[in-house]
């Protein structure tokens, strides 16, 4: 009788739903901002949050806050919370953290980017194409920052 070798359990991953959780578009300088030469300084802030809904089911929310200024005047402020519900099984610790803070936001980003672009265009501004984001690098930076802070507290 051949011995059965224990095989690691296969990771389970499914996208249950992708949806817009919250949208905000503000154009405080209108209509005067439309008279100015369009040479904006655009910035984007990114935030991710996750919460466990039930066993192996998580909501991940990616928040993109995009601002454009012409000189000192705010042209627009656009905030999009793109969310998803994901089934994730057979991951623990840092692998689960990586999945929820890098892999899932990477799935959500194209949806959020399209929503931001659409809102900016509806505000009658030129189309805004946000550059891709390396969520793996952002996750690694957050891990290193946390380790550094813990080391400072323990010394």
Swiss-Prot record:
Localization in the cell: Cytoplasm
KW Protein transport (keyword) present: yes
Swiss-Prot/TrEMBL keywords: Chaperone, Cytoplasm, Protein transport, Translocation, Transport
Main subcellular localisation: cytoplasm
A cellular component annotation (GO) from this entry: cytoplasm
GO MF term list: unfolded protein binding
Gene Ontology biological process: protein folding; protein tetramerization; protein transport
Coiled coil: none
SUPFAM superfamilies attached to this UniProt entry: SecB-like
Family indicated by similarity: Belongs to the SecB family.
HAMAP family the record matches: SecB
Oligomeric and partner information: Homotetramer, a dimer of dimers. One homotetramer interacts with 1 SecA dimer.
Role: One of the proteins required for the normal export of preproteins out of the cell cytoplasm. It is a molecular chaperone that binds to a subset of precursor proteins, maintaining them in a translocation-competent state. It also specifically binds to its receptor SecA.
Name of the molecule in the record: Protein-export protein SecB
């Amino acid at each position: 009788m051949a011995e059965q070798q224990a095989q690691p359990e296969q990771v389970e991953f499914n996208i249950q739903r992708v949806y817009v959780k919250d949208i905000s578009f503000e154009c405080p300088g209108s209509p005067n901002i439309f008279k100015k030469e369009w040479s904006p300084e655009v910035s984007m802030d990114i935030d991710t949050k996750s919460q466990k809904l039930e066993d192996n089911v998580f909501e991940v929310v990616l928040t993109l806050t995009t601002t454009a200024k012409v000189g000192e005047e705010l042209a627009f402020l656009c905030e999009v919370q793109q969310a998803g519900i994901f089934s994730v099984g057979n991951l623990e610790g840092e692998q689960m953290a990586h999945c929820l803070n890098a892999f899932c936001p990477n799935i959500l980003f194209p949806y959020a980017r399209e929503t931001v672009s659409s809102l900016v265009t509806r505000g009658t501004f030129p189309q805004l194409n946000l550059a891709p984001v390396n969520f793996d690098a952002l996750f690694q930076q957050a891990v290193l920052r946390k380790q550094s802070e813990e080391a400072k507290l323990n010394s």
